[in-house]
């Protein structure tokens, strides 16, 4: 049981980019794809969405604009990522910055990023 707790602790300490890399490595090793499960579940969720008000939002950085350094600083402040990870996220736009947040939090993050000069979308 202690081994399982150590694995949980190790996984919890990964950055977003490290977790994404781990997912890719596991997909390759096990011969599976997480995208297939998402694609199957996607249309069913989309059909149900119009009936209810959306409660969870994803803040997507569409582009960094002219003030890339300011946007990188804001992304670091919002996500807690390191400098390299935040720079990679900003340069790889469009990318999600925050996922599964409520409307107020999403609007707050959007305002912070737009103030820094970024173009942001809420999904």
From Swiss-Prot:
GO cellular component: cytosolic large ribosomal subunit
One Pfam family named in its UniProt record: Ribosomal_L12_N
Domain of life, per lineage: Bacteria
GO molecular function: mRNA binding; structural constituent of ribosome
GO biological process: translation
Keywords recorded for this protein, A-Z: Ribonucleoprotein, Ribosomal protein
Regions annotated as coiled coil: none
Primary role: Forms part of the ribosomal stalk which helps the ribosome interact with GTP-bound translation factors. Is thus essential for accurate translation.
Assembly with partners or alone: Homodimer. Part of the ribosomal stalk of the 50S ribosomal subunit. Forms a multimeric L10(L12)X complex, where L10 forms an elongated spine to which 2 to 4 L12 dimers bind in a sequential fashion. Binds GTP-bound translation factors.
Family stated for the protein in its record: Belongs to the bacterial ribosomal protein bL12 family.
Protein name as catalogued: Large ribosomal subunit protein bL12
